[in-house]
Structures are given as C-alpha cells and as structure tokens.
Amino acid sequence: MGFLNIALYFSIYSFLGWICEVFYCSVPVKKFINRGFLKGPVCPVYGFGALFVLYIMNWSNVNSAILIFILGGVIASIIEFIADILLEYVFHTRLWNYSNRKFNIKGRVCLFNSTLFATLSVMLIKLIHPIVKNIINRLNMITIVIIAILCIVILLMDIIISVKGIINLNNILRNMNIFKDIKKEFKLNKQRRFIEAFPQLEHKKYMAELKRFKELLKDLRQKNKHE
C-alpha cells in the first residue's frame, strides 16, 4: 500500500464511518445529525480503525470471519479508547460516555459498540475493501494523485477549522460569566452543531459552564421555533 492509496482508503473509510454514525444517531431521533468531531462528512477514527484492521489482518494473514470479528472488535475498541483519552487530555472534553451501558471500561468503550465495530470489521475485510481496492486499482496514477491531494488538503483544512472551534468553545465556557448578550446568539449558533452531535459532551474543567451553555442553546432553540 503506497502513501496515496493509504490516503484514499483513509478518506473513503472515514466517509463511510461518518455515514454509519449519522445513520446510527439520526434514525432514533428522526432528524439529521451531523455526527463527528470534524465539520465535514468524515469520521477519522473510522479511517484509522479501518487502516489498522486492514494492516493487522494482512500482516497476520487472517481470513477466518470469527478471528476477524474478534481482532477487529479489539483493535477498534483500543482506538476508540485512545481517542477518548487524547480528546480529554488535549481539549479537556469527552465526546461520548458509555457509563450507563453494560460492560463498559471507564465509559470510554462498551461491549455493544465493540460488537458493532467487530461486525463492521468483518464487512470491511470480506465485502467492502475488495470492492474499494478494485475501483482504486482501475484509476490511473494522475487521477489517484489529484483525488488524494484534494482529500488531504480538505481534511487538513477541516481539522484546523474544527480544532479552532473546540478552542473557541473552551474560551466561551471560560468566559461564561461575562458572556455579552449582543454576541450570545451568534456564538451559540456557531457551536450548536457540535453540541447537538454529542449530547453526552463533558468538559473536565468547565462542567457547570457547559451545563449553562447547553441550557442557553436549548432556550435559543425554543425561541427559534416560535419565531
């Protein structure tokens, strides 16, 4: 796997992961929720998970669906666990918490989600990746280079914008006591997508401020409905 192919696989599986997340979160509430840390239609954790699963399965030459199920679930759970730790350490936030689910580890991973990831791993190896690989192999080098560069540039821009959004959220929470009314609705709306995408969002430094922020957002949502 060359770098360009890896970039394409990462982009494709990040997009497919985003589709899974949107479907998983939107269907129960019967409305579209742009689920994901980034603003664009990608969930990088799925991209990383898919690449690691592909690498491990190829390296270990595993073909058994049962072994793929077990190893895929373990690999994906480790990545999810590490991602949650990194988000908490770097941004002081937790985007998900499985503490209310059975067989969870510190609320970072749980058996139910691990089982879903394990199932997706089997689908990836046995069904999805062979099709994706065949399509990419049919592309000429120039097309691959152009698509890969576009994906990388767009992803990097999205990461920068999204990280800036998290930093802005931290600044808003830090200054909640001096939150100016004239800027309130603007700032709330800018963070609305992120808050709605992760209703279990927690902040390790500004939990009370985050609770108030969510209440303000709820009031703004009710206000908009009546206008």
Kindly label every feature range from the protein language model:
Residues 1-227:
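Aromatic-rich, lipid-facing transmembrane alpha helices and their immediate juxtamembrane interface loops
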